[in-house]
Amino acid sequence: MKNTIKKGNQVLVLSGNSKGQIGEVLVIDRKRKQLVVKGINQKTKHMKPKRQGEVGQIIRREYPIHMSQVRLWNG
């Protein structure tokens, strides 16, 4: 029986900097076999001001990881 990962499931990260962490699936891209997990694979992006008078920002967001790097967590 194959366990399919769905939006809202808890997954365990098997490799990378976040190895051993558990998070909730936010977005799934089945065509690219990638998913976005809450709190996992976060990167910092520096945004320049686009208009005069605007202030630049530093944004932290989750980026997708490959499905082979996670396993469904039943905890």
Swiss-Prot record:
Biological-process GO terms, alphabetical: translation
Swiss-Prot/TrEMBL keywords: Chloroplast, Plastid, Ribonucleoprotein, Ribosomal protein, RNA-binding, rRNA-binding
Stored CDD domains: KOW_RPL26 (cd06089)
Keyword Cell membrane: no
Localization annotation: Plastid, Chloroplast
GO MF, one example: rRNA binding
Main localization, broad class: plastid
GO cellular component terms given for this protein: chloroplast; ribonucleoprotein complex; ribosome
Stated role: One of two assembly initiator proteins, it binds directly to the 5'-end of the 23S rRNA, where it nucleates assembly of the 50S subunit.
Name of the protein in question: Large ribosomal subunit protein uL24c
Species of provenance: Cyanidioschyzon merolae (strain NIES-3377 / 10D)
Lineage: Eukaryota, Rhodophyta, Bangiophyceae, Cyanidiales, Cyanidiaceae
